[in-house]
Structure formats: structure tokens, C-alpha cells
UniProtKB/Swiss-Prot annotation:
SUPFAM superfamilies noted in UniProt: Prokaryotic type KH domain (KH-domain type II), Ribosomal protein S3 C-terminal domain
GO BP annotations, alphabetical order: translation
Segments for region (Disordered): 217-325
Gene name of the encoded protein: rpsC
GO-annotated molecular function: mRNA binding; rRNA binding; structural constituent of ribosome
Family matches, as CDD domains: KH-II_30S_S3
Protein name per Swiss-Prot or TrEMBL: Small ribosomal subunit protein uS3
Family: Belongs to the universal ribosomal protein uS3 family.
Comp. bias intervals (Low complexity): 285-316
HAMAP family in the record: Ribosomal_uS3_B
């Protein structure tokens, strides 16, 4: 189904919006006829203006028309003369006050309607249809499109039998409803007849609707403003890689000063920390190594240096026993 239906109508309310926004009960038929006449009038004498689309919005006794064009200077005219003429024609056609807005298309290379119109103009100028299609595809992909498909149908190259040819580059997922796909159609008038040009341009995925995206962006901006700033990190907290060792050393030094000091009353905490730092010392004598007698390590304080290892009573008695043997 996605291969045949118009991509804009297939995605109404999901990724695309209505080009005519109004409500009518009994005058529905008249309003639809007016919209068709307005768009036909816009496209009749404005071939060189590059009009992409025309949005129509109605309120009570008033009409608003938005013209999206790639060349706003042609639509406005010299000192606004052309815009005044268009506004007068619209007021004469509808019998209401008309607000005319002329909007510029920022990136015409990825606008499907403008791309189709450009290919059709080249076909009318007797340019090879393959060359025109490939040139349009290259410019669209360079401008940021994720995929494009161009199709030409008719007496291509002046052939007696009409046919259809298309070229595609990138991805064009027509069945994916969240895909933002732009579609355009234009007819080229040649000496051999009319050639229809269709263009599909894939610009990416749209997960949410427009209102939901705007609400989410506003919420994110508010959260950024209300977020508290983080204070400076201290070295003793041990939260950073460079401050971990320094913080531990400062904590150990404070613990030693609070418990033992230089008077030797530090107890087992100082001995454990000194034993972790100091390398394992060799036994004073060979008998101590054989019997497995532990050798005490002196207490290390920040103010004094370590004293030489003292010989225990068991070691002193073991030396003569070895001599007697």
C-alpha cells in the first residue's frame, strides 16, 4: 500500500500536516472549490518563482495564505507590487480579507516539489532525462537527504512507446509511517508530449508529533536551568584518581596523630599501617628462620625514624645452642 498511495496523505497526523486548515459545516463544498482555485492561480503565472506549497487557513471573515517559495523576490516583486496584485486577486476571488505571507524555502535541494519542477524544466529544455535525474539525486544527497527516488514516465527520449524509468539512491522506506518522506510531482511539456516527474525524498525518522517534540524540548530546557551546579572536588574525599592516594595518606596521618603520636602509644593501628608500608624484613639469625619465631617491627611515626630491629630473648639463647652442637 505504501508503494502506491501519496506519502503525504498516508502520513497525515503522524509526520505530515494538512495544507488546508479550516472547519465548515454547510459551506464545505464551496471552501474546497476555493482552495483548488487559489492553488491553481498560484501555479499559473508563477512557474519561475519555485513555489513549493500553499497553506490556507480560514477564520471567521478572514483568510490567511502562506506561500512557500524558493525565490521570494519574484513573488514579492518590485516594491511589493506583485504581492499587492496577488492579494487583490485573492480578495476578489474569495470576497474576504486576505493575509498574505511569503515564506522562503531554506534548502530547496531537498524539497521534493522543487526537485521535480527542476527536472521537468530540464526535460523541457531537451536535456537527457538520465542526466537530469542523476544531477538532481547528487545535489539532494549532498544537501543532507538520506535517500531519494526520481521517476520519469512518458515518451522518454522521443521514443514511440512510452515507458517509466526511475533511479534511487540511499533509503526510501515508503511503508514506515514514522519516516519523514517528502513527495512532489510535476509535468514537463515536450515536443513529444508530456512527461510526468515524481520525486520521493527521505529526510529521516520522526518519532513524535510536533506538539510532543516542542513540549519535550521545553521541559529539557527547564531542567537544564534548574539543575544545581556541582561544587569543587576536594583531594581528601578520594573521588578523583589523583586525589585518592593523597586522601588516604592524609587520613592515615591524622589517625596516627590522634591515637599514638610520638610517645609510642599508637598501638596496633600504627603497627598494621607500618607493616603494610614497610617491606618484609629478613630474620636476624638462621635459628629464628628455622623455628619460625616472629620478629617485631618498630613503630614508625612521622616525627622519628625507624629504630634498628631488636634481638629477642629466644634468639639470644638460640645462638649458644648452635655453637654447642
Amino acid at each position: 500500500m505504501g508503494q502506491k498511495v501519496n506519502p503525504h496523505g498516508f502520513r497525515l497526523g503522524i509526520t505530515s500536516e494538512f495544507t488546508s486548515r479550516w472547519y465548515a459545516d454547510k459551506q464545505y463544498k464551496a471552501y474546497v472549490g476555493e482552495d483548488v482555485k487559489i492553488r491553481k492561480m498560484m501555479s499559473k503565472g508563477m512557474e519561475r518563482a519555485g513555489i513549493s506549497r500553499v497553506d490556507i487557513e480560514r477564520t471567521q471573515g478572514r483568510l490567511r495564505v502562506d506561500i512557500h517559495t524558493a525565490r521570494p523576490g519574484i513573488v514579492i516583486g518590485r516594491r511589493g507590487a506583485e504581492a499587492d496584485r496577488i492579494r487583490g486577486d485573492l480578495e476578489k476571488l474569495t470576497g474576504k480579507q486576505v493575509q498574505l505571507n511569503i515564506l522562503e524555502v531554506k534548502n530547496p535541494e531537498i524539497d521534493a516539489q522543487l526537485v521535480a519542477q527542476g527536472v521537468a524544466e530540464q526535460l523541457s529544455s531537451r536535456v537527457s532525462f538520465r542526466r537530469a535525474m542523476r544531477k538532481a539525486m547528487q545535489s539532494a544527497m549532498k544537501s543532507g537527504a538520506k535517500g531519494i527516488r526520481v521517476q520519469c514516465s512518458g515518451r522518454l527520449g522521443g521514443a514511440e512507446m512510452s515507458r517509466s524509468e526511475f533511479y534511487r539512491e540511499g533509503r526510501v522506506p515508503l511503508h514506515t509511517l514514522r519516516a519523514d518522506i517528502d513527495y512532489g510531482f510535476y509535468e514537463a511539456r515536450t515536443n513529444f508530449g508530456r512527461i510526468g516527474v515524481k520525486v520521493w525524498i527521505y529526510k529521516g525518522d520522526i518519532v513524535q508529533s510536533r506538539a510532543e517534540r516542542e513540549a519535550q524540548e521545553a521541559l529539557l530546557r527547564q531542567q537544564r536551568r534548574e539543575r544545581p551546579r556541582r561544587g569543587p572536588r576536594s583531594g581528601s574525599s578520594g573521588t578523583t584518581q589523583g586525589g585518592t592516594d593523597a586522601g588516604r595518606a592524609a587520613a592515615r596521618a591524622g589517625d596516627r596523630r590522634g591515637r599514638g603520636g610520638s610517645g609510642g602509644g599508637g598501638g596496633s593501628a600504627e603497627k598494621a599501617s607500618a607493616a603494610e608500608k614497610a617491606p618484609a624484613e629478613k630474620p636476624a639469625t638462621e635459628s629464628a628462620a628455622v623455628e619460625g619465631t616472629p620478629v617485631e617491627t618498630p613503630a614508625v611515626t612521622p616525627e622519628t625514624t625507624a629504630a634498628p630491629a631488636a634481638v629477642t630473648t629466644a634468639e639470644a639463647q638460640g645462638a649458644p645452642e648452635k655453637a654447642e652442637g
